[in-house]
């Protein structure tokens, strides 16, 4: 896959114990994406161990985005992940 945008990570995204590398992995290689607001996206993916991770990405424009929330996916999102894979 090719990505032509830049994705950064805000320090606040790491407060739930997800590493920066795993937050970026889940946000870049997401399985499900949903628009939360005009400039915010919920992205559901997996960390390097295969655990489901939820991220919120702020779209800044000009191809730039920032992950500002990352945590182990809550149960309410699990169905979205597994429904998408089948």
Q: Where in this protein do the model-derived segments appear?
A:
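Ribonuclease/tRNase effector modules and their secretory precursors
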Residues: 1-86
